[in-house]
Design a protein with these regions (language model features):
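Extended C-terminal regions of large enzymes
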Residues: 21-22, 31-167
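General structural signal for alpha-helix termini and helix-helix connectors
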Residues: 5-9, 31
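Core structural elements
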Residues: 1-2
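Conserved, non-catalytic sequence blocks in retroelement Pol enzymes and Pol-derived host proteins
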Residues: 8-18
Length: 168
């Protein structure tokens, strides 16, 4: 779906354009209103926001590359991170992620480093109210799509409730 994203420049505005298109696609797949909160989409899909997923994949790629047995690959990554920094796309992206997720640049070279730091940070930022709203939203979507049944409510009523939750 986003093959090669590990090599993207995370500072580029095109990444945000891609993420916006991805969220629009999620809204279309779930048949949700255009003004559905972005924070609900990743919870509804049981994942993390698309931008964070791209960062997670990048960090995993760089971490594995930095610890590779292949010395030319290891050298290029270490040079980009330790000396190139902002002049290197790899260095720029790691600094961006380090600032965003609160880790030290040198942590990448630690064998125990995990790109799941991104997932953990996203889960920390989540709140109980959003989870409850998304659980209700999921049940309403299933009811609207005739997976569940709910007596006493018309499709129009269910769609109104979905619209209200999505934009509240």
């Amino acid at each position: 779906s986003f093959y090669g994203c590990e090599l993207w420049n995370l500072w580029d505005s095109a990444v945000e354009v891609f993420c916006k298109a991805w969220r629009q696609g999620q809204r279309a797949v779930w048949n949700l209103p255009y003004n559905t909160h972005c924070r609900y989409l990743s919870l509804l899909c049981n994942g993390i926001p698309i931008h964070d997923e791209i960062c997670r994949r990048f960090l995993s790629f760089v971490h594995k590359s930095a610890l590779r047995e292949c010395h030319p690959v290891q050298f290029i990554v270490k040079y980009g991170l330790l000396y190139g920094r902002m002049f290197s796309q790899c260095g720029r992206n790691v600094l961006y992620c380090a600032d965003r997720y609160g880790f030290n640049l040198n942590d990448i070279f630690n064998r125990h480093f995990s790109a799941n730091i991104v997932t953990q940070k996203c889960q920390e930022l989540g709140n109980v109210e959003d989870v409850a709203a998304v659980n209700m939203l999921f049940e309403l979507i299933c009811t609207r799509d005739d997976v569940f049944t709910l007596d006493g409510f018309s499709k129009c009523d269910i769609n109104s409730i979905i619209d209200n939750i999505c934009s509240a």
